Amino acid sequence: MTRGLAEIARYAWSCGADPLTCAGLAGFGDLIATCTSTHSRNRTVGEMLAKGATLADITVRLGGQVAEGIGTTEAIHALAAAKGVDMPIAAETYRVLFEGKPVREAMRGLMDRERGEELSGPLANVSRLLRVTGVTTGDDRPPE
């Protein structure tokens, strides 16, 4: 979830937003709810994908209900590409949903990425905030 938050913060910053906004209820709070709630349609979509369902299968199974993450994935993929913002989770999610990439292959690609600073420059404030609140960003170093 923290890597996802880092992607969201990078995109928000590229649009001129304060990246700390992403650490609030509308950002991280919503991300926690959508990732952990058994009532989340987005989580349900992810679980179905992990079990091998296709987007067409999922659409039928949702029975007219909307999982907003599907459309959001398509939109953010195009927007991030246009702005040159690195969003590897969003990119892999797009490939799984719309290009049929196997979930295991997408996960492997994400986990095999070279370790680096998730947030730098003005975005480092988000990283520091997460550390102060006890949320790890995958970087074990103490805040500067």
State the predicted function of each range.
Residues 2, 13-23, 27, 31-144:
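NAD(P)-dependent Rossmann-like dehydrogenase/reductase catalytic/cofactor-binding core
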